[in-house]
Amino acid sequence: MKRILYFFIILLIIALGLLYWSTSSTDQVFKKSELINIKNINSVDFKTKDSVLVAASDLYQADEVKKLMQGEQYRKAWSTPVKVPVMYLDTLFGGVTIEKEGGGKQTHSLKLKTKNDIELTLRSVNKDPEALIPEFAKTLGLENIVVDGISAQHPYAAILVAKLAEYAKVHHTKPKLVFVPKQKTLDNYN
C-alpha cells in the first residue's frame, strides 16, 4: 500500500514539475499582433497599402511539454498569418469620431460614431488578461497559466458566430477583421 502511495506522490510531483515548466515559456502577458514581412512598422506608409498580412499573436506558441500539459488549443489559429484590409478612421463611413474608450477585462476597444450617428466598436483581437491574474499566481510565477488559457479561445470566433447567426436568422453583430495603423484620428490611443 505504501508503494502505491509513494508512486502516486512521485507522479503528482512530476506532473506539478512539468506543469510549472510548461508555464515558464514566456513572461509576457500581452503582445500586439505581429505584422508579417514588415520589419520596421514606423517606416511603412500604410496609406499605400490596401491590406497587410498579420498574425493575431505568437504568444501562445508551445513546445511539446506545454502542449502535453496545457493542450493544443487554437495555437495555430492565433499564429497563422491572415490578410486583412487596412482601415483609417477618417475615411471609414465618411469619417468617424472616437466617443470613448471601452473594453472589459480582456480586450482593448474604442466606441466610435459615424456622421450619421451610427455607433461602432473597434475591438482588439488580442486579449489582455492582466486584470484576471490573481496576485498569488504572479507571486508564484504562474501567470502564464491564465495567459495561456486564452489560446483555448479562437481568435476569429466572433466572425464565425456572426455567420452562423445569419444563417439561423438571429439578430447579430457584423464583425470585420481589419488592421488599424497609427493615425492622427487615434490621437493618444495609437
Give each language-model segment a name.
Residues P85-N190:
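Conserved ATP-binding subdomain of kinase catalytic cores across diverse folds
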Residues K2-E99, K127:
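Regulatory N- and C-terminal appendages and interdomain linkers associated
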